[in-house]
């Protein structure tokens, strides 16, 4: 039989436990990562059909090799369903951590949650998942990437200034449902809304691909032959737009001004040659920050919910000098 003193002690202990849980930081709910000599880490890439993704993968592989880490690499080939299956395979292989570049915001939520249930921490690279369904510090460790809204805003501000606030714009969007496409569209729209003469006359997805960007640009240029500018969510679609403009008998950089995002070697060369107005960098070299984050997390450090990549801006003033650094 419990004495009054014993009951009071148990109640006090229980109350303290509840209070501790209530005040525990969200990151404490994440699966831990033990410090050890060698890790087996998964990298679930979304695709590998463009220079940006190739550069990102090369950076991850090089940094893993530098630290003696076994990298389990998968390529979803642009399929969210395959990427979910890739993550499940990594879980089955017992990886210590998963770096995930999610194809789209919503479809990859089940993969993130399944990894958490399996006790495997996840770090998102380049793209986010839907924040209403999964949160950094609770369901995954952190997001490492650029500020896509700011990228779109910088592109819009440059175009508005260069065009003196007057332009009929064709927008080539990225993959529907992806965070960079959503955010780059938002940032650009915010920048040009201050200029009534800046009008988006057509906007359609080119899926971040050169060929599809060309096809979409051809269709939209036929529908809007008076367009004076093209805003592409990435450089690959901008390259496709060059071909579409030339096929329409228009001169890129003269008849139609193009602004884009990524900072690839092809884009910087086009800017230097006067074919393209400007491109906002989106740095693909994630390896150093990714594996630095792994090391910090293994030490028990609290990781900020967003590890920000800083990006440069390329135009006629610097593109030629920086081509050698591009990918």
Regions picked out by a protein language model, each given a short descriptive name:
Residues 1-24:
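N-terminal secretory signal peptides
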Residues 28-327:
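A residue-level marker of the well-folded mature domains of exported/periplasmic proteins
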